[in-house]
Swiss-Prot record:
Protein name, UniProt field: Transmembrane protein 205
Annotated source species: Xenopus tropicalis
Chief subcellular location: membrane
One Pfam family matching this protein: DUF4149
Membrane topology field: Multi-pass membrane protein
Any one Gene Ontology cellular component term annotated for this protein: membrane
Transmembrane stretches, start-end: 18-38, 53-73, 89-109, 168-188
Family according to the record: Belongs to the TMEM205 family.
Domain of life: Eukaryota
């Protein structure tokens, strides 16, 4: 099923649109939407919004990563890859792997843990402050006096950190692949 050679204008256009749409969505979600939202709505509302949007976001990135890798692999047989093409296909594969782990494992665990934390926080009248620094002392006291909450917070931070790293890895891989594609364009 390898289709070595010129993919044609339609396939090239689809490949570029999928990759650039994914990268643009990643940039917006990573560097704009979250920061604006956390500064503008209560903490639990922020978590609820993210719990609704992120599954779609994560699976769209996963689908785009799969399509990008599939198109690239179809027109670049492994036996004929140049060193730069080997790097590019590796970036597509790493992005797909990170997107899959993010969408199917790390993000859902982060969300489930967050909702468990919300239950405890509501019992202590927390979660309605706007911004990450709202009621910081109250959250600290809650961690100190409630070992279950402290354990949940540690789990949340661990999975949120790994989830964020997967997201950044995808963003960097897609950005690098866009640079590769731009450098190969004969003209604008």
């Amino acid at each position: 099923m390898v289709a070595e050679g010129d993919p044609g204008n339609l396939v090239r256009t689809i490949h570029l649109l999928v990759l650039s749409a994914s990268w643009g969505m990643q940039c917006w979600t990573t560097f704009v939407a979250g920061f604006v939202l956390i500064r503008g709505v209560p903490r639990h509302t922020f978590g609820l919004v993210q719990s609704k949007l992120f599954p779609f976001y994560n699976h769209i990135v996963l689908c785009c990563s799969f399509i990008s890798l599939a198109i690239y692999a179809a027109y670049h047989p492994r036996e004929l890859l140049s060193p730069s093409e080997s790097v590019q296909i590796t970036l597509f594969f790493v992005c797909l792997l990170a997107a899959a782990l993010h969408a199917r494992w790390f993000s859902p665990v982060t969300t489930k843990t967050m909702f468990k934390m919300h239950i405890i926080e509501r019992e202590h009248s927390l979660g309605q402050g706007v911004g990450l620094s709202a009621n910081r002392e109250a959250y600290q006291r809650l961690q100190e006096k409630d070992p279950k909450y402290k354990a949940l917070r540690q789990r949340f931070m661990r999975y949120h950190g790994i989830s964020s790293l997967c997201n950044l890895l995808c963003l960097l891989c897609n950005g690098a692949n866009l640079v590769y594609m731009a450098l190969l364009m004969p003209t604008l």
